[in-house]
Amino acid sequence: MHFRDNVILQAKNGPLDFQPREPYAPVFDQIKKTPLMAELQITQEYLGQSIHLTYLAPMWKEFFSFVSPQSLKGIAGVANIGDDTNWCGHHFSQANWYAFGRLAWNPDLTSEDIAKEWLLQTFAPEVLPSALDIMLRSHEACVDYMMPLGLHHIFMADHHYGPEPDGNQPHFPEEWKPVYYHKADSAGIGFDRSSKGTNAVSQYREPYCRDYDNLATCPEEYLLWFHHVPWTYKMKNGNTLWQEMQQHYNRGVSEVEDFVRIWHSLKPHVDEQRYREVDERLQKHLQNAREWRDVCLGYFGKLL
């Protein structure tokens, strides 16, 4: 296929669809002659929408650690603004719109740099240390209570909010079903994209092709993306896979519980309206995080 000289191909950052964590899309390795730009999702379609406090700059910086900004002609963002008075639904979701713009202008900025800038322009200086702590921990917390260790696509059908690990709607194509992606059974869990499975790993450049293909060298944050792993598999810290999954889900919920406590400590430094509106969302956030943990561990636990 030959494109005109003015064509720039736009590709999503990951191979699937803006999951809480994905490996980078190998299209950025394979397309060498046509200029590329990356598509990032500012709106939190799969990361709690406008309810969860999830700062996305760390996720985007993770992508840029694999795909150099210098190799791209630009980035596009799926915006998160709407008809809310605060534009983004959640006051802290404004930080994601801001972070996208700052990274588009200067991709060398750190997630912490950007969060500090935004906080100092948005809240009183006394809010900075504690709110910064929440923001920088929030993405990893989201991954933990939703889809840790490389799990993906286990959200509710249609609206993409909340967990549905048992999703197996007969009228949906296979590749729309959560059970197609986690492939959990009594033997283990995960999608085998190794050279012994679909061989999706072959699309990656070295050393990632080799590292992702080998169960022993595959980064644990992508483990279940690339491998179907026995429940009794020993992780690097000595836990079995099942123990590690439980630890991640519980840690994610504990993090959100801590976010609520931290926000409450900031009440003297935040105006009444914004304090109340953020707190209301944090309460729903915590409820949702517990639901994700309980539903997912309950479903997978029955398979062991």
Kindly give the residue locations of the regions a language model identified.
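Catalytic-core regions of glycoside hydrolase
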Residues: 1-117, 122-123
